From Swiss-Prot:
It is a lipid-anchor. A lipid is attached at C15 (S-diacylglycerol cysteine). GO terms for molecular function: acyltransferase activity. The record marks Y171 as: Role in the phospholipid gating. One of its GO terms (cellular component) is cell outer membrane. Its EC number is 2.3.1.251. This is Lipid A acyltransferase PagP. Keywords: Acyltransferase, Cell outer membrane, Lipoprotein, Membrane, Palmitate, Signal, Transferase. GO terms for biological process: lipid A biosynthetic process. The gene is pagP. Residues 1-14 form the signal peptide. It comes from Erwinia pyrifoliae (strain DSM 12162 / Ep1/96). PROSITE patterns: PROKAR_LIPOPROTEIN.
Amino acid sequence: MKLKPVLYLLMLLGCLGLKSAHAATLAHGISASWHSFSQTWNEPQTFDPYIPSIIWHNRWTYDADKIDKYNERPWGAGGGVSHFDKKGNWNGIYLMAFKDSFNKWELISGYGWEKTWRPLRDPDFHLGLGYTAGVTMRDNWSYIPIPVLLPLASIGYEYVSFQMTYIPGTYNNGNVYFAWLRWQL
């Protein structure tokens, strides 16, 4: 019977230790991300034009009449700066303006990070997988800045990358693939 309070105390201390370790890991992750953002801003290695290329509404999650009304050609442009860290991973800060699904102007600005792989013998071919965090502003939201945290992927050769993201959603809302070309100058 005296063992029960001791076990409860050990479990409580263990939980507090896990929360403390989790908080320390989260704090380290935020600190590392801020350092990468700061380094990209202050020490850019390339200046990059962006060309929005495609908006695709997932056909499994939309009614056909909705898809027929949507724009899937995102005319627009953007720019950014890039920095590759010691491990060869891509960091970027960007701003893009393009025609959204309703053919209205949308702005998006943020920071992106991709783990970069060079799986072939040719070191110029590369793949990337990571995330982007930023804000977007759209006509149907009265251009109020809305925070975004989205997956990011790319395939590239030398200084040109085809980057993409997927905006999750519900039926007839969200579930959009968005892609653009990025040149490193």
